[in-house]
């Protein structure tokens, strides 16, 4: 089981989800595996929880990059929801998408729903009016050279948020969190892995609400 997997505890059993990878490629040739244990010592292979498919038109075509799978249980719907970092087949790490799948049982099988960037057209809720005014002045053409002090300052002010506003924010390494009130959150590296964003999920955990914050910009 590679690094980046996630453990869910449900009804007396721990379920461990992770990428299935081989020695010859970092691409997903099988999908997401699941193991179960009642004592965290003895583990049972539950098989493939989410399978990639032999269809190049699918977002989860065999050969895509599928990483960091995490599963949470939705008490309202009775469904198990998996989110993961997804890169489209043959596109390297350019897509920076979040994928979501759902199942009636902890170990699956999970049904893939969709993938995409996060919260297209939405600004962070912790970006106040003054910050938005500054954002409007940022022009990417003025910061074509990365890693300069000026570029770093512009990133802190939201240069990449603005760049990705229409298409949605990048989502790579990620986890999920369910609060005591049942509200769930998607926590992920964004903005070329230079910031952390925390995005609220819908009541069914299958989409984003548009509410998110930026944490610790570079």
Which sequence ranges carry the predicted segments?
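Carbohydrate-active catalytic/glycan-binding domains of CAZyme proteins
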Residues: 1-218
């Amino acid at each position: 089981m590679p690094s980046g997997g996630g453990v869910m505890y449900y009804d007396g059993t721990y379920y461990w989800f992770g990428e299935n990878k081989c020695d010859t490629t970092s691409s997903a040739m099988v999908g997401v595996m699941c193991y179960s244990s009642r004592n965290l010592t003895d583990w049972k292979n539950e098989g493939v929880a989410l399978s990639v498919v032999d269809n190049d038109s699918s977002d989860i075509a065999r050969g895509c990059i599928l990483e960091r799978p995490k599963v949470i249980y939705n008490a309202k719907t009775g469904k198990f929801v998996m989110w993961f970092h997804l890169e489209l087949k043959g596109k390297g790490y350019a897509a920076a998408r979040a994928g979501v799948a759902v199942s009636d049982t902890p170990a699956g099988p999970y049904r893939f729903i969709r993938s995409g960037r996060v919260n297209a057209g939405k600004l962070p809720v912790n970006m106040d009016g003054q910050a938005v005014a500054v954002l409007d002045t940022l022009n990417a053409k003025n910061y074509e050279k990365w890693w300069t002090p000026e570029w770093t300052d512009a990133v802190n002010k939201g240069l990449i948020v603005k760049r990705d506003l229409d298409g949605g924010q990048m989502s790579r390494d990620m986890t999920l969190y369910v609060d005591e009130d049942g509200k769930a959150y998607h926590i992920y590296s964004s903005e070329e892995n230079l910031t952390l964003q925390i995005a609220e999920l819908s009541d069914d955990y299958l989409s984003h609400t548009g509410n998110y914050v930026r944490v610790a910009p570079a």
